[in-house]
Amino acid sequence: HACVKNGERLAKMAVEETGFGRWQDKVLKNKLGSELTWNFIKDMKTVGCLSEDKTKKVWEIGVPMGVIAALIPSTNPTSTVMYKTMISLKSGNAIIISPHPGAKKCITETYEVIKEAAELAGAPKGAIGCVTLITPEATDALLKHPDVSLILATGGEAMVHAAYSSGNPALGVGPGNGPSYIENSADIPMAVKRIVDSKTFDNGTICAPEQSIVTEYGISPQVEEELK
């Protein structure tokens, strides 16, 4: 609720500080990263015996990792803090936010909003932390710290590579080259609209939109016409 309540203010802060995106789209991203994420995960069991196959004598056991280091990008700063904090706490872990230097104000403010709300709801003090010394050396020290159990790295190729090379377990996310395929029977105007909407959302700052279009033979002229 705190994230949604402050969603517009934080979205405007992010655009003003970074110069990336549209604040209206970032409001939606903040809602996706907080309220909708929470509604999806709130009833999930994440710790203890998650499933049991008595026939095969296989049990799936969920165990918290410990301390998670979360690298936050400048393109999606506030929503990424919300999402990573929520999934970390839900799975029984503590989290340390590492802000991008180009978005430190809005990231730190989002951290403060979440920290206050989480502690009011009963989260242990210190379960959510944020790096205040924002330098490459500080980030490197965090990534390589022996007490860090997992790194969640969102950002450019160099940063994700640094996380993978740190010696600690890491999950990295960055820009990809995702093609979309339009088949002959597709509703071409609708397909093109969806692709353009995806690509232009938040002025194209999302890592996951379509980067290219592959069409089935014979419909490329129609697709090109719709794109004009």
Provide a role label for each language-model segment:
Residues 1-57:
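N-terminal Rossmann-like NAD(P)+-binding subdomain of aldehyde/semialdehyde dehydrogenases
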Residues 42-117, 121, 166-170, 177-178, ...:
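Conserved small-residue-rich beta-alpha loop and adjacent elements
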Residues 47-60, 129-148:
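A structured beta-alpha segment of the ubiquitous adenosine-cofactor-binding alpha/beta core
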Residues 90, 160-228:
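ALDH superfamily catalytic-core signature
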Residues 108-109, 120, 134, 138, ...:
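Glycine- and Gly-Pro-enriched alpha-helical subdomains that act as flexible
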Residues 133-137, 157-159, 177:
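Short acidic loop-to-helix transition motifs that present clustered carboxylates
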